[in-house]
A protein has these predicted regions:
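A short, N-terminal "cap"/entry segment at the start of jelly-roll beta-barrel domains
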Residues: 1-8, 94-154, 233-238
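Conserved short histidine dyad/triad with adjacent acidic residue
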Residues: 1-2, 10-28, 153-169
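Exposed loop/turn and edge beta-strand positions of beta-sandwich/beta-sheet ligand-binding modules
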Residues: 11, 73, 152, 171, ...
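Conserved metal-binding segment of the jelly-roll/cupin
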Residues: 19, 46, 52-73, 79-84, ...
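Double-stranded beta-helix
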Residues: 72-121, 212-238
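C-terminal functional regions that serve as terminal interaction/effector modules
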Residues: 149, 156, 160, 164-165, ...
């Protein structure tokens, strides 16, 4: 089988692009995103719109959008890819197409693309976010990705020394710290983490986080797919 899944519905992988490299324009059924770990000068082109991919950005590639990427900088760039490929394999609407021109023409350059959440925006939005009154999460914001209904995207801010209240729910979640360090407990496993790491909380495992440093924690989840199907359950620890 195609045993690549990070969770039942989600897959993640790290990617490096070297200066001068380009990926030809293509499209596929799965929805995708990138969390940019280290980059100066790389870019993405989605449906003819070119925008930067800089350190700390989150970049979207909704299913069946023409897209490619390249790198005009002078140092390697690194990011974390996240897709719903396992779900697409299960349901079987897997399609892929290369652009007939190889590299599609850039129709416009837009640093403020709706497919890009900048690091500056993420910092500002999490600073303004309200605290979770139940204590399960940090100051958390859901990023808008209406064209990608199978993947929910969150960023949350945890202060140094902050611990969250333990919970479990019927959704898969992949976490990646964008800033800071800490330890999370998933099920019975204690997982130390730092910037650029990735760890997964499969469905119905207890989850809690402890931040050692001020932290911005990215997560992607199938929670909203579960809500749509009326499968979603949430339980807080006593």
């Amino acid at each position: 089988g195609n045993d690549i899944a990070t969770a039942k519905t989600l897959v993640n992988a790290y990617q490096m692009i070297l200066p001068g490299e380009e990926a030809k324009t293509h499209r596929h059924a799965p929805h995708a995103l990138r969390v940019i770990i280290e980059s100066e000068g790389s870019f993405s082109v989605v449906n003819g719109e070119k925008h930067p991919m800089e350190t700390g950005d989150i970049v979207l590639t909704p299913g069946w959008c023409w897209h490619g990427h390249g790198h005009d900088g002078d140092q390697p760039a690194y990011w974390l890819d996240g897709l719903d490929v396992p779900l697409t394999h299960l349901l079987e609407p897997m399609f892929f197409e290369e652009h007939p021109d190889g590299f599609a023409a850039v129709e416009r350059v837009s640093p403020d693309s709706p497919y890009r959440f900048t690091w500056e925006t993420i910092l500002k939005r999490t600073e303004r976010a309200a605290a979770d009154t139940e204590g399960h999460f940090g100051r958390r914001v859901r990023l808008e990705a209406d064209e990608m209904p199978t993947i929910g995207i969150y960023v949350e801010r945890l202060e140094a020394g902050q611990s969250t209240r333990r919970y479990r729910h019927s959704a898969n979640v992949v976490f990646s710290p964008m800033m800071g360090s800490g330890v999370s407990t998933v099920g019975d496993a204690d997982i130390p983490w730092g910037r650029g790491d990735t760890f997964v909380a499969p469905t119905w495992n207890w989850i809690e986080h402890h931040a050692i440093e001020d932290t911005i924690l990215f997560s992607m989840t199938d929670e909203f797919l579960m809500r749509f199907a009326k499968y979603y359950r949430f339980e807080a620890a006593a």
